[in-house]
Regions:
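Hydrophobic anchor residue at the start of the ABC signature
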Residues: 5
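Conserved catalytic motifs of ABC-family nucleotide-binding domains
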Residues: 12
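Catalytic Walker B motif of ABC-type/P-loop ATPase nucleotide-binding domains
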Residues: 16-20
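Short loop immediately C-terminal to the Walker-B catalytic DE motif
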Residues: 22-23, 55
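Helix N-cap at the start of a conserved alpha-helix in ABC-type nucleotide-binding domains
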Residues: 27-29
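ABC transporter nucleotide-binding domain
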Residues: 34-118
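C-terminal coupling/interaction segments
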Residues: 104-146
């Protein structure tokens, strides 16, 4: 894959379309490849369309996250909005029953507690101080949507 990307970059493209470009690479090589991608997009007229199952790569290099599941568009959002605002509320049934459902995206019941994906974790932390509110990763957000 490294050779293919080097060959593509040699043609001075404005757009790279990459499918699983970092899969199969060891963590050090993957990190170096992501640095190459970041350097490439520093030029204003350069973009990369990157398809990847490695969500940590997306968190490092993406500006926008588009999630497609079973051929259907699930969401397309600014990555910073997802990482900076979305959160997971962990709570019991008493707090769960009082949650403002307009702020929730999805939830999972786990034994005696709920995990709820919310659009605004700061608002949730303020409104429900007895709940545990934590940042949501891109992977967690995707898993809640399916």
């Amino acid at each position: 894959m490294k050779l293919a990307i080097a060959a593509a970059l040699a043609h001075h493209p404005e757009l790279l379309i990459l499918d699983e470009a970092t899969s199969g690479l060891d963590p050090i090589m993957r990190d170096e490849m992501l640095d190459v991608f970041l350097e490439f997009v520093q030029e204003e007229n350069h973009s990369i369309l990157l398809s990847s199952h490695i969500t940590s790569d997306l968190e490092k290099v993406a500006d926008y996250i588009t999630f497609i599941h079973k051929g259907k568009l699930v969401f397309s959002h600014d990555k910073d909005d997802l990482v900076d605002n979305y959160g997971i509320v962990s709570c019991g049934s008493v707090i769960f029953d009082t949650l403002d459902k307009t702020d929730t995206i999805a939830y999972r019941k786990e034994a005696d507690k709920y995990k709820v994906l919310v659009r605004n974790r700061n608002k949730a932390a303020k409104n429900y101080p007895k709940a545990i509110v934590s940042p949501a990763t891109i992977e967690e957000i995707m898993l809640f949507y399916v």
